[in-house]
Amino acid sequence: MEADWDEVSQVAVPPPGPHLLPTVASTVAFDDSQELLWVGNEFGRVSSFYGPELQRYTSVKAHASSEGQVRQFLFHDKGVISLSANSVHLASRCGLTQWHISHPEMTELRCMSFTAQPHKIIVAGLQSAMFIIDVEKGAIVDQLSTEYRYTIMKRSRYLCAATDTGSVNVLSLTDFSVVKSWKAHGAVINDMDARNDFLVTCGFSVRHAGSPIVDPLANVYDLKSLIPLPPIPFHAGAAFVRMHPRLQTTSFIASQTGQLQVVDLMNPNTINLRQANVAFMLGLEVSPSGEALAINDAECSIHLWGSPSKIHFNEIGKETEFSDIPTRPSMLDWSNDTPLNVIGMPYYHERLLSAWPSHLIFEIGNAPVPMDPAILPYLRPSEIGQYAQNPRKKRRYQVENTRLQSSTEVALAAPKFLSEKARELPNSKPEGAQEAVGALQGLKINGETKEDPLLKYSNVEIKYSKFGVDDFDFRYYNKTEFSGLETHIANSFTNSLLQLLKFIPLVRNLALHHVSTNCLCESCLLCEMGFLFDMLDKANGQNCQATNLLKTFSGFREAANLGLLEESLSNKSLSSAIQSVHRFFLNQIAHDYRTVYPNSDSLDNTLSTAAVESICCMFCRNEIVRPGNAFVTELIYPAADPKQAHRNQACRFSNILRSSIERETQNRGWCSTCRRYQQVSIRKTVQRMPLVLMLNAAINNSAHRRFWSIPGWLPEKIGVMIEDNQIQCYEGEQLRIRQQNNFEGLVVYELVGIVAEIDIVEQKKPHLVSFVDVSISAREPTKKSNWHLFNDFLVTGVSKEEVFSFNQGWKSPCTLAYQISTGRHGLDDSWKNELDTTLLFYEWSMNNRPPTDKCHILKSEEKPIAGTPIALDTEFVDLEKAEIEVKADGTQEMIRPSKSGLARVSVIRGSGNDEGVPFIDDYITIKDPIVDYVTQYSGIKPGDLDPRTSRHNLVALKVAYKKLWLLLNLGCVFVGHGLASDFRKINIQVPKAQTIDTQYLFFHPGKNRRLSLRYLAWAVFKEYIQEETTTTTSTSITTTTNPNIHDANTSTTTTTAITTTPPEGHDSIEDARMALRLWKKFKEYEDAGIVNQILEEIFREGVKVGFRPPARYPSQATPNPNNNNINNGVNPNGLSTPGSTNPISRLPLSGRNTPDFILPASASAAASVTGGPAGGGSSNGSMSGSTPSTPRQAFRRSTALTPSNGSFGGAKGLTFGGSPMR
């Protein structure tokens, strides 16, 4: 060890998982051919580090975590050999597995070494067998028995092996017989090394107190003469030793406290001492070159020692292979005019498959006819295949043409769009209700005389017109007061399960009480359920969407690993998927609940079946008891014939439920006493039943399915008693008798709902529905059941007989929910009085950016109360563009609308001394890819939503959402413009009584047009907002006089310069403040009784200027060929006068952040002349004269909207009676 040796680098041992803490290294070794240091941990992971800087190179899972730590490394030309307690693993240095060997008798491997043959190794341990493994073949070639239990092996002239008793056996390299044996230490040998003719050992001995201590001597042995040599004293305690690879008599000895000693075995008085900066040393390793030393400590670190100027692991090492750095593709100037051929295609030398000639296309045999699912339950095995009775659905010799697509698909026809109904039936009575009732109560198809029950179970699908989802008539599918859930969202197959959970009163109470706390965890599924349940309550039959909840669900890595997400369901049945999601939901909400209430057992009492599980070995009778709590019970069906169910009590639902809860099974498992796998019996003993009993039907075959086909098999009520640690279940007459006799301890459950899979053959695509008894969660007490079908956004009442009938092959139960009967009507709304509003009075930021000076957080004395007005405005960015299908005739159909993400929320005070001052101005961080920031309308720029670069106050979506949710439930009244669109994108439901939308305040019943906020600001206040450009005008005047001519005229030249700056987009604070001012002004008009006159004037001026503010400056106005006014409607002061037009302005006309199309100047001017009062047209005629500049404007002119939160008021929809203020 030279004088400049010191610690060169230090690296932490990689943790076993991405969210786990680092662990100590169990073994360390230098590669003998490359500049790599290999490290093994306690969980079977092997990692490598490159060079003196210890850069991470590879990391692989070589052994199972159950096998414990990695014990030792050996190096071969093919790769790295690692050893664990039960296996030997060879992987290339790049991490690819070459072979993995395990054996039943490999129970406690500890060490290995190369033999006399370089391609064979011997492995041994605390076991009676040693194995010879051929590295080239990757197989065990020999097995040797031994009476010694070895812990360490080192190869030199002989094979030196340390035993667990402190002895060292010198083994022959040919037959592995014991040549010599020494008792090196009193207890165990902790470390040893052998090189050339010397063997050095370090170990422990037992002293008088009975505990082992480190020996202060390192024993030395001569392998040539097989005699011991004088030991080397080491007063700090010799714990680790390594021989120098190039100096034959030099060794490194170290203590557990980090003291290093370099000593010459032939001259022990010549020593070199160093102290390593470690708390507790666990290992020592020397590189093959002798220039580097690796120290492993108890603080999960690896320390590399050496000379900084010339440290190398190997004298002549091979070059380490690294992954290729991919060449970045060249940047293309991509635009709408860029031809596709600039992208290019790969070089090819053969003809492409796409060039297949048409004359080589032939028709082959027809596809086989699909099996009729009606005969599947009746199949019987035979010698070859299976057989069943012919159902005789076809005539003799009649076959099915499988090439033709089935045109008899049973489906509920989509209703007409609201715009079509308003356009086609302007004066007729609304018939949409009659159409919906007829469809949902059973339409007659193909002349059938009976009602077709499949219609309401059909797949429902949202259709989109050019006006988006607002034009779809959801009320056609739902005439009830219970809201459905939309389907155009990823993982919406869980809608049926969410509806079932919502109508369980005790689960609903848990979710709402949890969300009213200060929980701000972004991935809290229980909070999202609370938000959804509250939204469904407030919707009162209007369609809702579970966007935020399903987005949170999609973000769980565990859900993706379990294959629970929609993209993983291609080869998985919906029935098994929803049952897995059911288990995941309940386990996750239990975890979320405990994060807020770690010491509360309310959720466990509600959902968890408390039980203990006893595991008994059938051989030695050793028994282990562990907790066996479960949130979901999987039904286990008996092997009895369902046909004998009426005579066999074991086939009753109550007995199947009892055996499923108190299940007793036999399986093979590990017995710690026998130390091997044995047959074990597992029995569960129930200690407490939950208030809500959640079941999975677990139908795996046709025999299970036949139990459900028995009429009346599923009971509406069940009774459960626990007597002497045994559970008893009752149903029917048995339950009724025990209820009448008031049996002590009897708990009665009633069925809340069922999730079922609907698989109608003609539809070719299964889906899920839920049946719910809504009377259980009704606020008004009632004993009569009221069953409803929830088929996504189709909601209708159904009879109890239809719910409990499962003898149809297309309906299969998946999940059931029973609730204790005393919890009926148990809706607890006390959470509304216990809202934790701390978030409203606290500055929350992800990037430590305080709110701007414009924003002032609410003070405690400003706590909102019911009726407090607040003004709201939001901005959004595009996460996905709309999917448009272009048909063969050129028509376009929207398949899926664009997907927006909330980017900014601004809320300002609507009353008080600080009226108009914002108290919320949050930018929301978005993890999803953003396809368009729509800066010209949103004001959001790239980088504004990135915590690393944003200059704004960034919060998580849940924080921004919860602030609005708190304000909603405090009773605040939201003032804004176009709030319906904002609320839909935010995914929040606000009652009409808490909404004031200036879009509907300034609505003329006979004009059929909604005015933009920008135009209203100009029409009411003559102010300009939402301007795309900032214009600066400068004027210079030059006067010239000829002095040679008396009384000469003076000429004056005026130069005007106009400078424009790029668009900055909308400011949500400015828009919210303007909406608040418009509401205040409207109240003044109401008090004065001049609302109608003002609206007439606003619309009259709007016709003149095209419902857009006129140009602010003269040079911005476009000459109108039909207008002879030399100033073109612009006064000398630069402010527009009524009647001026700007037909080619690109500013929005109406709607929220809606871009307009550019109209030709002639067309717009002609429209203004034709439609204006000068043209002699009526008000309707003037409206038709103004050409719509967007599809949404065209729709607004064809039909009127009511103030019902932005939805259409029926098929007629042509009148609007009054403002929402009245």
Curated annotation (Swiss-Prot):
One of its GO terms (biological process) is mRNA processing. PROSITE patterns: USP_3. Residues 1035-1067, 1110-1152, 1167-1222 are annotated as: Disordered. It is found in: Cytoplasm. Its cofactor is a divalent metal cation. Its EC number is 3.1.13.4. Binds 2 metal cations per subunit in the catalytic exonuclease domain. Residues 452-821 form the USP domain. It comes from the Eukaryota. WD repeats lie at residues 104-143, 276-315. Keywords: Cytoplasm, Exonuclease, Hydrolase, Metal-binding, mRNA processing, Nuclease, Repeat, WD repeat. Residues 1134-1144 have a biased composition (Polar residues). InterPro entries: Exonuclease_RNaseT/DNA_pol3 (IPR013520), PAN2 (IPR030843), PAN2-PAN3_catalytic_subunit (IPR050785), PAN2_N (IPR048841), PAN2_UCH_dom (IPR028881), Papain-like_cys_pep_sf (IPR038765), RNaseH-like_sf (IPR012337), RNaseH_sf (IPR036397). Catalytic subunit of the poly(A)-nuclease (PAN) deadenylation complex, one of two cytoplasmic mRNA deadenylases involved in mRNA turnover. PAN specifically shortens poly(A) tails of RNA and the activity is stimulated by poly(A)-binding protein PAB1. PAN deadenylation is followed by rapid degradation of the shortened mRNA tails by the CCR4-NOT complex. Deadenylated mRNAs are then degraded by two alternative mechanisms, namely exosome-mediated 3'-5' exonucleolytic degradation, or deadenylation-dependent mRNA decaping and subsequent 5'-3' exonucleolytic degradation by XRN1. Forms a heterotrimer with an asymmetric homodimer of the regulatory subunit PAN3 to form the poly(A)-nuclease (PAN) deadenylation complex. Contains a pseudo-UCH domain. This ubiquitin C-terminal hydrolase (UCH)-like or ubiquitin specific protease (USP)-like domain is predicted to be catalytically inactive because it lacks the active site catalytic triad characteristic of thiol proteases, with residues at the equivalent structural positions that are incompatible with catalysis, and it cannot bind ubiquitin. It functions as a structural scaffold for intra- and intermolecular interactions in the complex. The linker, or PAN3 interaction domain (PID), between the WD40 repeats and the pseudo-UCH domain mediates interaction with PAN3. This is PAN2-PAN3 deadenylation complex catalytic subunit PAN2. It comes from Coccidioides immitis (strain RS). The lineage of its organism: Eukaryota, Fungi, Dikarya, Ascomycota, Pezizomycotina.
